[in-house]
Regions:
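Conserved donor nucleotide-binding strand/loop of the catalytic core
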Residues: 33-36, 47-81
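Acidic helix N-cap motif at the loop->helix transition within catalytic regions
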Residues: 18-22, 44-53
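Short, acidic, metal-binding catalytic loop of nucleotide-sugar glycosyltransferases
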Residues: 25-33
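Short beta-strand-to-loop acidic/aromatic patch adjacent to the donor-nucleotide binding site
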Residues: 83-94
């Protein structure tokens, strides 16, 4: 709980058995009330590990619904348990959970209703090992999207995001794609509705177990 706001962390998972526990152990439970993990029909024991860690809400898809479909389940469940602030955190340990508290404070203090953990602000991406081709593609796509949307975000492709429940209730995210383009569609919906979006610099880690969109699919949108 943070300033009377119920904080819920949602974790869209796919074969995250190797990294889930260390990600979970860094979540700041001094403010986080509940955690939701959605296993998108992965082939490992992610769901079992989540249950053993004490995660109360573990949902297993009966078939692979895709990255966007996974997020829809996450957000729908968070709203159903009356979350006031919802933080999406990938369980692949690429993003540090230690920033959750800072992101939530920004929303709880009504500075911004949406906060993105940006890998591009500062030197987080390259220092953390982001491949050069991904960094260049990210910068090019972000430039194009900023021009298209008349915005000045440092990136549109981060998987570390925090939302007020009001925001989630007022956009039709369930109408979006079930694939990776979901993230960009969601940001476009927020901008269309006039919501201000804040950013916070986020150090990242790139290693074999960390999952991310591949180069080819990043150009779908």
């Amino acid at each position: 709980m943070l300033k009377s706001n119920k904080v819920v962390v949602v974790m869209p998972a796919y074969n995250a058995a190797e990294t889930l526990e260390k990600t979970y152990n860094e979540i700041p439970f001094s403010i986080v009330d509940e955690v939701i993990l959605v296993d998108d029909f992965g082939q490992d024991n992610t769901a079992e590990i989540a249950t053993n860690l004490g995660i109360k809400h573990v949902i297993k898809h009966e078939y692979n619904k895709g990255y966007g479909g996974n997020q829809k389940t996450c957000y729908n469940k968070a709203l159903s348990i009356n979350a006031d602030i919802v933080v999406m955190l990938h369980p692949d340990y690429q993003y540090t959970p230690k920033l959750i508290e800072s992101m939530c404070h920004i929303i709880a203090n009504k500075l911004y209703p949406v906060v993105l953990g940006s890998r591009i602000l500062g030197k987080g991406a390259l220092k953390g090992g982001m491949p050069i081709y991904k960094y260049v593609a990210n910068r090019m796509l972000t430039l194009f999207q900023n021009i298209l949307m008349n915005q000045k975000l440092s990136e549109y492709h981060t998987g570390f995001r925090a939302f007020s429940s009001e925001v989630l209730k007022n956009i039709k995210y369930n109408d979006n794609s079930d694939d990776f383009i979901f993230d960009n569609q969601m940001l476009a919906q927020l901008m269309y509705k006039g919501y201000e979006i804040g950013e916070i610099t986020c150090p990242t880690k790139y290693f074999e177990e960390a999952s991310s969109i591949n180069f080819k699919r990043s150009f779908v949108y």
